């Protein structure tokens, strides 16, 4: 029986660890990074009048946008202020109107 050289075993372990790191990167880190970027662009595109949903499931219409907060009108006389990060999506069926560029 031949014994594997210590250098070969070490090289195999290094290659194995690099492969695990690459799998971790492409399956976890990269998709999260893309999702964060998509959410950032979504938040930047919000305008007054947009119909949105918060992470807690509250549906409302944007009435005010601050640097770090967004105020939603959720009922006739009810407005609630949220952190921008709490806004996760447009309401189903809501079509955002594009501004015409002349």
Curated annotation (Swiss-Prot):
Q: Which domain of life is it from?
A: Bacteria
Question: An example of a Gene Ontology BP annotation on this entry?
Answer: protein transport
Question: Where is it found, in Gene Ontology cellular component terms?
Answer: plasma membrane
Its subcellular locations are: Cell inner membrane
Pfam families, A to Z: YajC
Q: Self-association or partners: how does it assemble?
A: Part of the SecDF-YidC-YajC translocase complex. The SecDF-YidC-YajC translocase forms a supercomplex with SecYEG, called the holo-translocon (HTL).
* Family assignment from sequence similarity: Belongs to the YajC family.
Q: What is this protein called?
A: Sec translocon accessory complex subunit YajC
- From what organism does this protein derive? Aquifex aeolicus (strain VF5)
